[in-house]
Amino acid sequence: MELVPVVLDLIGIFVFALSGSLLGVRIQFDIVGVLVIGAVTGLGGGIMRDVLIGAVPPASFTDWRYFAVPVVAGLVAFRFHPDLAKIEPYINWFDGLGLGLFCVLGSQKALIFGLDPVPAVLMGVLTGIGGGVLRDLLADRKPIVLRADFYAIPAFAGSLVVVLTWEAGKFHEWVLIPAAALCILLRFLALHYRWSAPRATDIW
């Protein structure tokens, strides 16, 4: 694997796993629960993507770093949660960072495995939101992507940049960085300005 995608992937896993682990601490999970919800949050989207595109066994099962990173994130959250309490209100911001990194990596991998543009964009979105959906289900709360949050749309935008540059023959791994930045920026703006996706009751 190329250096940039690997580094971004591991950063994304850590950030997502940290957000999931902090949630686990908040809702009184024990050490096992914190590690599990952290690992599921960090790895869930990528595993679902790999299974769907035929990249089996998933990367998470063939590279020890993919399991080591969420374990470290979980232990950090469990041990230092009193010190991390001041950043807990910003857990959605950490989630936004993971969303941006994962959506672009997901769409890139889908393209490498020969998917057409539209499915590749959808795989990027799935990679970005999948871990968060599983996290919310484990925490017994409605998934954030279903709560009218402006969440899947930023992932769609970041994935679309990757796919368009790929189709135009202009793709380079460094494209992943501005594409992820676009998704992260949109998500951060949504959090700051409280943007939400339209609901039926908003229109009719």
Annotate each predicted stretch with a short phrase.
Residues 2-13, 58-72, 116-128:
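Structural signature of hydrophobic alpha-helical transmembrane segments
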Residues 6-19, 37-40, 158:
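The first (N-terminal) embedded transmembrane alpha-helix
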